[in-house]
Amino acid sequence: MNAKIVNTLNQPPIAGPFLVFNRLQWAELRKSVPLTLTEQDLKPLLGINEELSLDEVSTIYLPLVRLINYYIEENLRRQTVLNRFLGGQHPKVPYIISIAGSVAVGKSTSARILQSLLANWPQARKVDLITTDGFLYPLADLQEKNLLQKKGFPVSYDTPKLIQFLADIKSGKPHVKAPIYSHLTYDIIPNRFNLVNQPDILILEGLNVLQTGNKAKTFVSDFVDFSVYVDADEALLREWYIRRFLKFRQSAFNNPHSYFKHYASLSEQDAINTATNIWDTINGLNLKQNILPTRERANLILHKGADHAVQEVKLRK
C-alpha cells in the first residue's frame, strides 16, 4: 500500500500552544496590505544600533498589523454587544498592545514601527506609545534603597503607579498622565508628562510588561489585549548591547549633561570591558531571572537573527 504524500510546505508547524512560521510563511500572510512607510519615514523610527529595511517592515510587520487589526475589529464588536446589553453608550476602551523583550533587542524600534503602521491604517486610528521607563523610581529613590544595580529589574519600577495608569486608560479617562524618563540624565524628568487622551490603541513598551510575580493580585499584563515578545539569543543580545554602548560613547556620553559622561573618555577596550561587565552583572542577569521566563506568556514571539532580521514568528493559537 502506497503512503499518501501530503504537501505541508506552506503549513506552519505546531509547537505546544504556538504556531511557528518561518519568514516566507509569515510574509505570505501580508496578503494585499499596502506599505505606507518610505525609507525617509523609516529612518527616525530606528534605534542607534539598527539598520532595518523596508523589506523587513513588509515581511514581518505588515502581516502582524493585519492580524492585530482583525483582533481590534473583534474587540470593537464585543464592545458594541456590551453597550447594547447595558442599554447605553459607554466610554470607548482603548486596545492595549505590549512590547516586551531584553535590553538591546530592539523593542523601541518595533513599537515605533507598529505605531506608524497602525496609525496609517485605513481606519485612521489614534495610536499612542508609552514606555514603562517613565514608571521607574526616580534615581534618588533607587540610590536611597540601594537598587541602582537592579535598575530595570521589576523591583525598580513603581508598579502600583503603572497599574493605576493602565486602569485609568482602560476606564476611558481623558488626559491620563504618564511620567517621562530621560536616557540622558538616567532619571525621571520632574513635572514633565505625556498626556494620553483616549486613544484607540495604546502601545506599552518595556522590559517587564509580561511579568506576574507572587505577591500582587493585579498585573500589568491583566490590562494587555495583545502582547509581543521580541526575542534573540543571549549571545547576540550581549553583542548588540556592547556595540550600542560603543556608539553611545562616541555620541550621547559626550553630552556634559549625560549621567554616563565619565564613560566618554574610556579607551575602546576599556569601554568593551565596561559594557561586558554591565551586561553580565545587570542586563544579562535581569534577562535570565525576570524577562526570558515571561516569553512564553506572549501572544506573539518575534525571534531575531544576527542581522536584526526576524527569522521566526511564533503565534499563540
Curated annotation (Swiss-Prot):
Taxonomically, which superkingdom?
Answer: Bacteria
Q: Which GO terms describe its molecular function?
A: ATP binding; pantothenate kinase activity
| Gene3D superfamilies xref list | P-loop containing nucleotide triphosphate hydrolases
Keyword Cytoplasm carried by entry? yes
Which InterPro entries is this protein grouped with? P-loop_NTPase, PanK, PRK/URK
User: Which SUPFAM superfamilies does the annotation name?
Assistant: P-loop containing nucleoside triphosphate hydrolases
Q: Which residues bind ATP?
A: 101-108
Which pathway does the record list?
Answer: Cofactor biosynthesis; coenzyme A biosynthesis; CoA from (R)-pantothenate: step 1/5
Compartments (UniProt record): Cytoplasm
- Return the GO cellular component terms, semicolon-separated: cytoplasm
Q: What is its EC number?
A: 2.7.1.33
Question: Record's family?
Answer: Belongs to the prokaryotic pantothenate kinase family.
Listed name of the protein: Pantothenate kinase
The gene is: coaA
